[in-house]
Amino acid sequence: MEESINPIISIGPVIFNLTMLAMTLLIVGVIFVFIYWASRNMTLKPKGKQNILEYVYDFVIGFTEPNIGSRYMKDYSLFFLCLFLFMVIANNLGLMTKLQTIDGTNWWSSPTANLQYDLTLSFLVILLTHIESVRRRGFKKSIKSFMSPVFVIPMNILEEFTNFLSLALRIFGNIFAGEVMTSLLLLLSHQAIYWYPVAFGANLAWTAFSVFISCIQAYVFTLLTSVYLGNKINIEEE
């Protein structure tokens, strides 16, 4: 399998991965267009495109609200909707096509097949939970709940680290493996003409399975985000 390289540019000490940046902007654009299109001319009795949006919205609220609680859900409902849609699209982009130049420069892939990208997403999720904890409960109460009793501080630190790491590695492992397998099947189809029907059928079946796994991973990522956030903002005070 040919090695692919994502194009990068440097602005001072900051390095930008152009493929990841382009894919992220594309995903944000698709989500904006979808929500804008589906929310135009909404009626009390939903139909057509409005049904699609409301179904996805109700689905996301259904599995996140038990963790956040009805008290705060209205403040985070749109965040979880957009996060779920973002992860679904990001996980499946690499299954749609492959754009790679002769020199191995890759211009199209799932952002979540990149470990650095997943680590960044995971870090932002953990950071968000702490920011919201401070905003909802105050700095002193947030620190107190994290450091009291004193002997559990190492365990709390370890828990935050494992949450961060597992959230990133879970999504990376599944999506990266899916793209690698797809590339291998495509490579098989170019070995000989008699391998083409086999590779085509196998790739079709694998793509369908990968789409299912990608959607499951988007569900798990959003669910765990709601769990981590709920644990931070719903702590009962003694």
UniProtKB/Swiss-Prot annotation:
Compartment(s) of residence: Cell membrane
Classification via NCBIfam families: ATP_synt_6_or_A, PRK05815.1-4
Transmembrane segments: 15-35, 76-96, 111-131, 167-187, 208-230
Keywords: ATP synthesis, Cell membrane, CF(0), Hydrogen ion transport, Ion transport, Membrane, Transmembrane, Transmembrane helix, Transport
Species of origin: Streptococcus pneumoniae serotype 19F (strain G54)
Family: Belongs to the ATPase A chain family.
Lineage: Bacteria, Bacillati, Bacillota, Bacilli, Lactobacillales
Function: Key component of the proton channel; it plays a direct role in the translocation of protons across the membrane.
Topology relative to the membrane: Multi-pass membrane protein
Subunit: F-type ATPases have 2 components, CF(1) - the catalytic core - and CF(0) - the membrane proton channel. CF(1) has five subunits: alpha(3), beta(3), gamma(1), delta(1), epsilon(1). CF(0) has three main subunits: a(1), b(2) and c(9-12). The alpha and beta chains form an alternating ring which encloses part of the gamma chain. CF(1) is attached to CF(0) by a central stalk formed by the gamma and epsilon chains, while a peripheral stalk is formed by the delta and b chains.
GO BP annotation list: proton motive force-driven plasma membrane ATP synthesis
Full protein name: ATP synthase subunit a
Keyword Repressor tagged: no
Pfam family, one: ATP-synt_A
InterPro entries cross-referenced by the UniProt entry: ATP_syn_F0_a_bact/chloroplast (IPR045082), ATP_synth_F0_asu (IPR000568), F0_ATP_A_sf (IPR035908)
Cell membrane among keywords: yes
SUPFAM superfamilies documented for this protein: F1F0 ATP synthase subunit A
GO MF annotation list: proton-transporting ATP synthase activity, rotational mechanism
GO cellular component: plasma membrane; proton-transporting ATP synthase complex
